[in-house]
């Protein structure tokens, strides 16, 4: 999931660090819609990996998703390999996880993990644009630690509005 819409306060970027930008009112609304969609359309989330950026943390809070969270600086300005390493470190006891991160990385990760059985419409939409609050749903067979490129099935892409 990409973080929800953030605000650009007066004086940005000099006035406030990018890491500390908060959600815009639209982002608060979209994060809530995203959480509702996740609760309705995917199995219960058992683990969340979330960027330490304020907008990512606020996205998670306003989504209402309640699961153990690991906030990690590594997801802020991460490259796809770093995000995949973080996913591979998830405990095998976890069957459903949520990653709250940033663009352009989150779309690159979703597409890099996408393999056979993929929803081609969803993949095309992700490659065109991964808007704020966008959610890519992937099925991963096997253990997290064995996750490889092109090994997951992209089953849905949703943008709450």
Swiss-Prot record:
Record keywords: Hydrolase
Recorded hits in InterPro entries, A to Z, give: His_Pase_superF_clade-1, His_PPase_superfam
Q: What is its EC number?
A: 3.1.3.-
Q: Does the keyword Hydrolase apply?
A: yes
Q: Name one GO molecular function term.
A: hydrolase activity
Q: Which domain of life is it from?
A: Bacteria
Indicate whether Oxidoreductase appears among the record's keywords.
no
> What family does the database annotate?
Belongs to the SixA phosphatase family.
What name does the UniProt record give this protein?
Uncharacterized protein ML1117
Organism in which the protein naturally occurs: Mycobacterium leprae (strain TN)
